[in-house]
């Protein structure tokens, strides 16, 4: 004689077809990173400073692009990353006088009328 009735012995749960469907979906899902190193990577930088050391000077004609990263939770200092025409990226000292001149030239160059 059983203490539980035959109805109480059955535990309700997901059907076998639902379990099979979930297993199939898990097998078909490709493992990999959720976010790739695309444009979102620039926004979602690692939470650390980009520049571990800075270069004091570089000729302004060698610079093709400047990126300025403000103080934030990732780093307690302003960082300036210069992309050079040869493809390299270097960190520049944001307090360097030459960099202030380069930034001023860039700002003045955009306001010139031809």
Swiss-Prot record:
Q: Which InterPro entries match?
A: Chemokine_b/g/d (IPR039809), Chemokine_CXC (IPR001089), Chemokine_CXC_CS (IPR018048), Chemokine_IL8-like_dom (IPR001811), CXC_Chemokine_domain (IPR033899), Interleukin_8-like_sf (IPR036048)
Q: Which UniProt keywords apply?
A: Cytokine, Disulfide bond, Secreted, Signal
Q: Tell me where it resides.
A: Secreted
One GO-annotated biological process of the protein: neutrophil chemotaxis
Quick one: a GO cellular component term?
extracellular region
Swiss-Prot/TrEMBL site (Cleavage) positions: 44-45
Which SUPFAM superfamilies does the record cross-reference, listed alphabetically?
Interleukin 8-like chemokines (SSF54117)
- What PTMs does it carry? N-terminal processed forms ENA-78(8-78) and ENA-78(9-78) are produced by proteolytic cleavage after secretion from peripheral blood monocytes.
Q: Give GO MF terms, alphabetically.
A: chemokine activity; CXCR chemokine receptor binding; identical protein binding
Signal sequence region: 1-36
Segments forming a coiled coil:
none
Gene3D superfamilies assigned to the protein according to its UniProt record, in alphabetical order: 2.40.50.40
Paired cysteines (S-S): 49-75, 51-91
Q: Which domain of life is it from?
A: Eukaryota
Instruction: Please give the family membership noted in the entry.
Output: Belongs to the intercrine alpha (chemokine CxC) family.
Q: What does this protein do?
A: Involved in neutrophil activation. In vitro, ENA-78(8-78) and ENA-78(9-78) show a threefold higher chemotactic activity for neutrophil granulocytes.
* Subunit and partners: Monomer. Homodimer.
Name of the protein this chain belongs to: C-X-C motif chemokine 5
Organism listed in the record: Homo sapiens
């Amino acid at each position: 004689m059983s203490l539980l009735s035959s109805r109480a012995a059955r535990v309700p749960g997901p059907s076998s077809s639902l379990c099979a469907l979930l297993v199939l979906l898990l097998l078909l899902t490709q493992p990999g990173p959720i976010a790739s190193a695309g444009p979102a990577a620039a926004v979602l930088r690692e939470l650390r400073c980009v520049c571990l050391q800075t270069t004091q000077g570089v000729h302004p004609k060698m610079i093709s692009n400047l990126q300025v990263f403000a103080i934030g939770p990732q780093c307690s200092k302003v960082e300036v990353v210069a992309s050079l025409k040869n493809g390299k990226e270097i960190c520049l000292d944001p307090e360097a006088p030459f960099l202030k001149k380069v930034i001023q030239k860039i700002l003045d160059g955009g306001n010139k009328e031809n």
